[in-house]
């Protein structure tokens, strides 16, 4: 049974990637429940604001950082592992696994956001290109010129290809 699932991994990843490329993360779903990556970010942010205090020693901060890691990663990993184990007994469990991997991919979203920047730059519209880039970077773009905006879009594309496509596929492949 367990060996059979390993032959299904490429199919599971292909289904998840295809869903993301074709559908992305639908706006209606995002409006109603948000996005799993956003949920995890909120958990991390909560721990950061609760535990990362200037008055704590470096040793305490490191210990609290490790605690944050385990309180964030362990429950998510445990739940994912339990779900995967339950799905192994279902004939079409691989489809459900693909549906569970799909939200962690950002292929269509990344393409759309970077294309919005490129389209605005093609029209020589710095205001629109700054606005489009501000949706994918966290820096101040008030005085950004065309080269800075283009560089920011390329940098974001590179980083987010790793974070939003390669890493989720890699970890899904391993686990």
Tell me the role of every PLM-derived stretch.
Residues 1-175:
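Hydrophobic alpha-helical transmembrane segments
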């Amino acid at each position: 049974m367990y060996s059979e699932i390993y032959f299904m991994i490429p199919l599971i990843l292909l289904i998840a990637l295809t869903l993301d490329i074709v559908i992305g993360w639908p706006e209606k779903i995002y409006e109603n429940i948000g996005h799993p990556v956003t949920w995890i970010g909120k958990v991390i942010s909560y721990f950061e604001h609760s535990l990362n205090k200037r008055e704590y020693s470096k040793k305490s901060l490191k210990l609290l950082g490790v605690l944050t890691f385990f309180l964030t990663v362990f429950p998510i990993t445990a739940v994912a592992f339990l779900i995967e184990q339950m799905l192994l007994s279902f004939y079409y469990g691989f489809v459900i696994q693909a549906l569970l991997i799909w939200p962690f991919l950002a292929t269509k979203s990344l393409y759309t956001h970077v294309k919005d920047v490129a389209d605005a730059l093609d029209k020589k519209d710095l205001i629109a290109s700054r606005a489009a880039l501000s949706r994918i970077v966290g820096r101040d773009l008030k005085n950004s010129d065309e080269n800075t905006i283009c560089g920011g879009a390329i940098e974001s594309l590179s980083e987010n290809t790793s974070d939003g496509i390669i890493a989720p596929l890699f970890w899904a492949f391993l686990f």
